[in-house]
Design a protein with these regions (language model features):
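Alpha-helical membrane insertion/targeting regions
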Residues: 1-203
């Protein structure tokens, strides 16, 4: 939400975040290839796919808000998100049974569940995009980007913030950013209620 009221600066920051996350995704895939049996790199891989699908939905929601049509890209990253969600839930069960440090199976479960719920959301939204108001798309954009930021920050703190207590490394980003997601989502929801009920196609 940096310079949210200044679209030009907001786009610059948004594009920087988008390409930075693409680098993170590529590096996490490389890490998993090198260390396929490492719970840490498995978690980073799952998070990176979640972030990839998130930033794609976040960016595409702006285009859809402006009247663009739903394309195969929407369904492609929705399918990828669903596969990743099922995989993360499976890894959660595996690491619970294996006795891995408790934070890993918990977060696999949390982010896996988020992925599955997002698949349901995508199906509802992309099946009937004409029913959404511009502010509905904006709310989807904001919540998705904040969700991607939460996931990527979690990966960063786990990887680099070893000076923090273990619970802060693994759960701190969610504890700090989730309230912001609810706050801005609530503001956009309130704006939506005040707005005219006209769908996108009539604007």
């Amino acid at each position: 939400f940096y310079n949210f009221k200044d679209p030009k600066k907001h786009r610059i920051v948004g594009k920087t975040f988008f390409y930075a996350m693409l680098v993170v995704v590529i590096s996490s895939i490389s890490g998993l290839i090198k260390h396929p049996h490492s719970a840490f790199f498995q978690f980073l891989f799952g998070i990176s796919i979640l972030v990839l699908c998130g930033i794609l939905r976040g960016v595409r929601s702006i285009f859809l808000m402006k009247g663009a049509a739903v394309t195969n890209l929407e369904w492609a990253y929705t399918i990828l998100l669903g596969i990743n969600g099922i995989w993360m839930l499976g890894m959660s069960a595996y690491h619970f049974n294996a006795g891995t440090m408790i934070a890993i199976p918990i977060l696999f479960s949390v982010f896996g569940t988020m992925s599955v719920l997002d698949v349901r959301k995508n199906w509802q939204v992309f099946s009937q995009p004409q029913l959404l108001h511009r502010l509905d798309w904006m709310r989807l954009h904001a919540s998705t980007m904040l969700g991607a930021f939460t996931a990527s920050t979690t990966a960063f703190t786990v990887n680099a913030a070893h000076f923090l207590p273990w619970w802060a490394q693994w759960f701190g980003p969610t504890m700090l950013i989730l309230p912001l997601q609810f706050y801005f989502g609530g503001k956009l929801k309130a704006m939506r209620k005040k707005a005219a009920p006209a769908p996108i196609e009539t604007m």
